[in-house]
Swiss-Prot record:
It comes from the Bacteria. One of its GO terms (cellular component) is periplasmic space. This is Vitamin B12-binding protein. GO terms for molecular function: cobalamin binding. Belongs to the BtuF family. The gene is btuF. The keyword Disulfide bond applies. Disulfide bonds join C186-C262.
Amino acid sequence: MIVRFLCWLTGLLLCTAAYALPQRVISLAPHATEMAYAAGMGEQLIAVSAWSDYPPEAKKLEQVASWQGINLERILALKPDLILAWREGNPQRPLEQLANFSIPIVYLDAKTLDDIPASLRQLATYSRHPEQAERAATDFQQEIGRLRHTGEGQNAASLRVFIQFGTQPLFTSSQATLQSQIVSLCGAENIFSDSPVPWPQVSREQVLRRQPQAIIIGGSPDKIASVQTFWQPQLAVPVITVNEDWFSRSGPRLLLAAQQICSQLTALSPGSSSAK
């Protein structure tokens, strides 16, 4: 009788735990959507933000947010039991209003590379497949560790890199950003790592004074020629391209950006047989 009771109680607890998981999740940022899928929450998502295009299944979901704002009325009509948000990218007032309706909000605001596996583990507590979240977090950590070890061994700190966003105006990133941290991970030096703001606007003259030895841009290789033309004749250095979505979104695919950048920087490092 006792054994039967314990079995019944165990089953009840398991059912209660499963029932407590959110069933109707809304993501308000592309990187949050990617994080949710990586954490095994894809089947729990009911709506996403604009530009949530990865994985491909995300494009089939209703969009309730964009750069223009959050569709508060539609979100409330969908009756979510969890919202994944982004402090820097989502307007705060509608988020406060959603919180007033007692809708739980999880903020995914990675500031460092280590924050990404931490966020995946946080999402594991809401996922029907927590083991998938843990596996994604572990894989990310291990590969970042490998790249860090390789970068330290390259002795490439003398390779000065300019991370370029746009041309007119011209923006870059400081060490406070994930993009700059990737450059450091690869053993190189971001020439504007010391900027007091994360995304400084810089002038052509400021870049030239700091004498970069390579430029990193987000986009496809067909952009290289226009970037080289922009800097000629004062600056003629290699231009490295990286998939823009990988590089700009603070999600699991940032690891792919790191692999791509580290590989290309290694080829340019002093002592490399590929260095020119």
